[in-house]
Regions:
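Bacterial N-terminal signal peptides that target proteins for export
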Residues: 1-11
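Bacterial N-terminal signal peptides
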Residues: 9-19
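N-terminal (or domain-start) structured segment
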Residues: 25-112, 149-150, 157, 161, ...
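An extracytoplasmic/periplasmic, membrane-proximal ligand-sensing/linker region
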Residues: 29-31, 171-176, 257-318
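Solvent-exposed, polar/charged alpha-helical surfaces in well-ordered, non-transmembrane soluble domains
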Residues: 49, 53, 57, 78, ...
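Hinge/capping helix and adjacent helix->loop/strand transition within the periplasmic-binding protein
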Residues: 79-88, 102-186, 239, 244-279
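C-terminal lobe and pocket-closing loops
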Residues: 121, 205-272, 301-304, 318
Length: 318
């Protein structure tokens, strides 16, 4: 009797394995949800609404962008982590997955996922409301030193938009007052309306800066950017800060290897599409493709860097 049960168990296991293999071979059979853990209209949302159709061409299936905002990106991260590991949920991520984890805002980290690929990198810019009196970064610094804790900075607390000004604070010996916003779009609307003084932004806002609706004070790249040659780097102003927001794709831990291979192949094809760099340039970002092997090492290194930054900034909670 026991041998019969053992044989039956073996047969059932074999059938399950064959069924899983067939299902993976047919992947994708239904739409794939791409979770963007911030509000619609923000940088990550815009980038992946451009990128998803390029991935679709390679996959032969539909990718639907789903904005799951809240709790500094944590709500969407948790939903992605807890989704079935079947390839029908993928996660749009950037460096905040490290910063929110180490500042105690989130309980989800990059190690809860499988890497697909790194897609873009966007240098950060110190950006001021047009209603502020500062003509340049030097005048901001001088004013901030006269009134510590009075200049307001919009940020998603614990995220990259918080880490960047905190690094500037520390390097320049300043003290800002932070106002929390869930995502880029509401933060930039507050800045445009003069409800806050400063925020981290990037070249997606160049049109508004050119129109006088915002003021670019300094960029956090290693050298001046050709798109904004008159904007100095923080380093040339004596503020030793370089910072960029790096965006990639992850899948839930345990996603089948053959499904991951298809997602990675589609990500590679999309990132190498000849029209993609030009599309990203319009959105103020650079294509920075790394395959899953390169991205794995990048995530590991970036995680350690963010932990160190959280410690240096007095924000480490883990």
């Amino acid at each position: 009797m026991s041998s019969t049960r053992a044989l039956l168990a073996a047969v059932l296991a074999a059938v399950a394995a064959i069924s899983a293999s067939v299902a993976s071979a047919a992947y994708p059979e239904r739409p794939i949800k791409l979770i963007v853990p911030w509000a619609a209209g923000g940088d990550t949302d815009v980038i992946y609404r451009t990128f998803a159709p390029l991935m679709q061409k390679e996959l032969g299936g539909t990718i639907v962008v789903a904005n799951v905002g809240g709790a500094s990106g944590t709500k969407g991260a948790r939903e992605a982590k807890d989704a079935p590991a079947d390839g029908y949920t993928i996660f749009a991520v950037h460096d905040s997955i490290h910063s929110t984890y180490y500042t105690g805002v989130a309980d989800v980290n990059y190690s809860d996922f499988e890497p697909i690929c790194l897609v873009t990198s966007t240098p950060s810019i110190v950006t001021a409301s047009p209603k502020t009196p500062w003509k340049d970064m030097k005048s901001l610094i001088a004013d901030a030193k006269k009134k510590p804790g009075q200049i307001t900075v919009g940020a998603t607390l614990g995220s990259t938009s918080h880490f960047f000004p905190a690094m500037v604070e520390q390097a320049a010996g300043l003290k800002f007052k932070y106002v929390s916003y869930e995502g880029t779009a509401p933060r930039m609307n507050a800045l445009l309306g003069g409800h806050i003084d400063l925020a981290e932004s990037n070249l997606t806002q160049k049109g508004k800066a050119d129109a006088g609706q915002l003021k670019f004070l300094a960029i956090a790249s290693d050298k001046r950017h050709p798109e904004v040659p008159d904007v100095p780097t923080l380093k040339e102003l004596g503020i030793d800060v370089e910072y960029a927001v790096n965006r990639g794709l992850l899948a839930p831990k345990g996603t089948p290897a053959d499904v991951l291979a298809k997602l990675r192949s589609a990500c590679t094809a999309a990132a190498k599409d000849p029209g993609f760099p030009g599309q990203m340039k319009k959105h103020g970002t650079l294509v920075r493709f790394l395959d899953h092997n390169g991205y794995t090492g990048f995530l590991r290194k970036n995680d350690a860097l963010n932990k160190d930054l959280a410690k240096e900034l007095g924000m480490l909670k883990r």
